[in-house]
Amino acid sequence: MSIRKLKPTSAGRRFQTVSTFEEITRSEPEKSLTEGITSSCGRNCYGRITSRRRGGGNKRLYRIIDFKRDKFGVPAKVFSIEYDPNRSARIALLHYADGEKRYILAPVGIKVGDMITAGDAADIKPGNALQLKKIPVGTLLHNIELNPGRGGQMCRAAGTYAQLVAKEGKYALLRLPSGEVRNVLSTCLATIGQVGNVMHENISIGKAGRNRWLGKRPEVRGVAMNPVDHPLGGGEGKSSGGRHPVTPWGKPTKGYKTRNKKKPSSKLIVKRRGQK
């Protein structure tokens, strides 16, 4: 994938960059692997906003992705590389030898016609899925399970990967994109390689309207609100808020740790992100 800079025919297009989509081989999704998706606009079942700054955006069809990779020993052929509006990564359509079709995240280096499989007997090549205990130390991984059989939960965004650092007993030590180093059960599945669409992080949105297409609404500063709406609101004229920066619910922001210290998975974290 490469990035194309648009001609500055207007102020909104001056700094805008877009993907060239040269890796896409098919424009229409597999109908049997799509379903409707309804936007809640950040509201819960009572109609109250629980996730701010959401709403609008283009309609989408949800592509059903195989994060579990539980079709062991059955070879599959990469039929197409497709765009997915629900995620930053590209997706690959697999045609299995028994006739089944599934979508997976498309890793770097995968192309139409490649053969992919899952299981302990699979080769160490991009797109194949194995248990962590069967993967050599130093390998780059994505779509990693936290619990065996639950499906991949880590490293699914475009360009991300984790590195297998060591294997000790029933655990495998992984270095995650955030810099965190943590233990994961060695019986968990992971997919070989780095997630594709690596240049996604370098795309410049360029204008506010393009974020609205994605369903993202504006973020209003607390000091611009009324006192009833935010702890930093109110005051005559422009004010600084009069206190250290806080969330709308009064908790300190800018560096305040919010992780629960009693979380059971804390004992699996060897080094927290940001630590040297």
Curated annotation (Swiss-Prot):
rRNA-binding keyword on record: yes
* UniProt keywords, alphabetically: Ribonucleoprotein, Ribosomal protein, RNA-binding, rRNA-binding
Top-level taxon of origin: Bacteria
Gene3D superfamilies assigned? 2.30.30.30, Nucleic acid-binding proteins, Ribosomal protein L2, domain 3
Q: Which SUPFAM superfamilies match?
A: Nucleic acid-binding proteins, Translation proteins SH3-like domain
Q: Name any one Pfam family assigned in the record.
A: Ribosomal_L2
What GO CC annotations are associated with the protein? Answer: large ribosomal subunit
Task: Give a GO biological-process term.
Answer: cytoplasmic translation
Which residues does the annotated region (Disordered) include? 224-276
**PANTHER family from the UniProt entry:** LARGE RIBOSOMAL SUBUNIT PROTEIN UL2M, RIBOSOMAL PROTEIN L2
Say which family it is in. Belongs to the universal ribosomal protein uL2 family.
* HAMAP family reported for this sequence: Ribosomal_uL2_B
Q: What does this protein do?
A: One of the primary rRNA binding proteins. Required for association of the 30S and 50S subunits to form the 70S ribosome, for tRNA binding and peptide bond formation. It has been suggested to have peptidyltransferase activity; this is somewhat controversial. Makes several contacts with the 16S rRNA in the 70S ribosome.
Kindly provide the name given to this protein in its UniProt entry.
Large ribosomal subunit protein uL2
The gene it comes from is rplB
